[in-house]
Amino acid sequence: MKNLFIKGVLLSCLVSIIASCTDMKKSSSVVIDKDQIKKEIQERENQFAKLLNADEVKKIGYYADDAVTFYQNMKPLRSKEDRLEFFKDDLSSNTNKISFTTIEVFPSNDGIQVVEVGYYTVVDSTNTAIYTGHYMSLFEKRDGQYVCLRDMSASDME
């Protein structure tokens, strides 16, 4: 009798564990459309380039307020004001145009955060590439739109 009771308790525990694991698996399966995320990120990059090229830096909504940008050979830009000042200084002295190409995206399991690997090209007034390089950006979806939290770049030019 005692042996039968122990077997019953063990069987109940085993069934409970299996049932709870099965329920967790069902509830945590979120379908991530990597191609759609890549398209959304590329749209953000296109909008960012368009505003930079038009010298409309105050309209740039690409970055989150708490974003940090790591450019080469300078201290990280940690505030919106620092970033705006950098763009103003950079854009005021040239007529170059920049474009960004999303190469790969690596979304989190829930699609809220995305790491992007991309390529940038800066061309002069004759449409000749004068700077090229790669970048990595970390995006987070806030209020239904991806915003950049961290980014860094590396030039291909010597």
Walk through the language-model features, giving the residues of each.
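A solvent-exposed, acidic/Ser-Thr-rich amphipathic alpha-helical stretch
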Residues: 35, 56-112, 129
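Solvent-exposed loop/turn segments at secondary-structure junctions
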Residues: 74-76, 121-122, 154-156
